């Protein structure tokens, strides 16, 4: 409770190599990953998107188009699917990845700094609220229900068939 005259010396030492490894995104292996042709969906999030020509276009046995038309339409389907997909990913992939990153960062921040502290606070306060609610129920609602029950228990009905 007295006046403190001591000085507090605090030093923070940080290794530059350890700091750079853990705080930044490592882009060193991205070019190798893109060139290696590795599996870009290792958890099979989009395994249901196996869309081929036969999944979309099918001719029954009784009605077949000319073979050249079938071959050309199959080739046109595959080429257009490939070109349009490449064009759309070129146009939309980076903005959508940025938007998804911002969304997930926002949701993570809200979950960590707002939702979980609120839930923990509610769980901390809940036993007190439960005790108060039980007291109110025992003091007000239970006697009221008991007296209403006693009043209606003395009522008797007799039905006669005339």
Swiss-Prot record:
Intramembrane region residues: 87-107
Keyword Cell inner membrane applies: no
Primary site of residence: nucleus
Cytoplasmic side: 1-86, 108-162
GO BP term (any one): regulation of cytosolic calcium ion concentration
UniProt xrefs under PROSITE patterns: CAVEOLIN
Topology within the bilayer: Peripheral membrane protein
Keyword set, alphabetical order: Cell membrane, Cytoplasm, Golgi apparatus, Membrane, Nucleus, Phosphoprotein
Entry-annotated residues carrying Phosphotyrosine: 19
Coiled coil ranges: none
Name this protein carries in UniProt: Caveolin-2
Protein's organism: Canis lupus familiaris (Dog)
Chain's gene name: CAV2
């Amino acid at each position: 409770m007295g006046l403190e005259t001591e000085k507090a010396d605090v030093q923070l030492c940080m290794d530059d190599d350890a700091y750079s490894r853990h705080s930044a995104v490592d882009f060193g292996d991205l070019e190798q990953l893109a060139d290696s042709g590795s599996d870009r969906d290792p958890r099979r999030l989009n395994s249901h998107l196996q869309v081929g020509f036969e999944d979309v276009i099918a001719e029954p046995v009784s009605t077949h188009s000319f073979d050249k038309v079938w071959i050309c339409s199959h080739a046109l389907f595959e080429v257009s699917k490939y070109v349009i997909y490449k064009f759309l990913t070129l146009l939309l992939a980076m903005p959508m990845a940025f938007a998804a990153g911002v969304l997930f960062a926002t949701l993570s921040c809200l979950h960590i700094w707002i939702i979980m502290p609120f839930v923990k606070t509610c769980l901390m306060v809940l036993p007190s609220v439960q005790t108060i609610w039980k007291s109110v129920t025992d003091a007000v609602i239970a006697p009221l229900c008991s007296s209403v029950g006693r009043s209606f228990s003395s009522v008797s009905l007799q039905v006669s068939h005339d």
